[in-house]
């Protein structure tokens, strides 16, 4: 899985979470955690990709 696929997965998950009523920041954090555990990527690496 390359960088763009990871970022795309995070954005898609964030959008789904935002549609449930979660605000954008909380949705991003939850999406990062979900993708981190789903694809076995360290959370710190995902946060570097996103730019946090």
Predicted regions and their residues:
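C-terminal alpha-helical interaction appendages
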Residues: 1-52
């Amino acid at each position: 899985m390359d960088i763009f696929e990871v970022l795309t997965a995070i954005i898609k998950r964030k959008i789904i979470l935002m549609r449930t009523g979660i605000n954008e920041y909380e949705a991003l954090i939850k999406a990062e955690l979900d993708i981190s555990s789903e694809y076995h990527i360290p959370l710190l690496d995902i946060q570097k990709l996103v730019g946090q």
